[in-house]
């Protein structure tokens, strides 16, 4: 039920010795996809904080993704704190997009790959399922 903070993001970047560049796409591997076929997938994951989301936008990273079922903390944690979809709501005032339920992030290198995202063409919605494909130059 915890959230990823700005300090968590900075620490993770330092760990892989990487400095964000404008228009980088940031994919966050929380480990949740390791148990996405279990009930706890919906209740036991880490989400992004609104502050960390805004920080990524300030770094000119406008697309992010996570292997968790939602970009925010689990629904039960949001109800407990009475803060519903805070990271999602950043989209109401900032131009960014996020992708949820990603899998196989551990098969990608920490950086240096391309990402293509193919959404289903739905009309009148704010979201749709996608096929996300990591492209690694060899």
Predicted stretch roles:
Residues 1-138:
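Active-/binding-site microenvironments in catalytic and ligand-binding cores
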């Amino acid at each position: 039920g915890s959230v990823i903070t700005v300090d968590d993001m900075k620490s993770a970047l330092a760990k892989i010795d990487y400095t964000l560049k404008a228009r980088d796409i940031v994919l966050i591997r929380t480990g949740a996809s390791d148990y996405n076929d279990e009930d706890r997938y919906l209740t036991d994951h880490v989400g992004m904080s609104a502050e960390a989301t805004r920080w990524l936008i300030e770094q000119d990273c406008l697309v992010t993704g996570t292997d968790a079922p939602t970009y925010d903390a689990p629904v039960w944690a949001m109800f407990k704190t009475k803060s519903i979809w805070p990271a999602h709501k950043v989209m109401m005032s900032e131009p960014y997009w996020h992708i949820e339920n990603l899998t196989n992030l551990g098969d990608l290198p920490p950086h240096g790959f391309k990402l293509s995202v193919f959404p289903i063409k739905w009309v009148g919605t704010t979201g749709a399922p996608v096929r996300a494909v990591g492209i690694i130059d060899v």
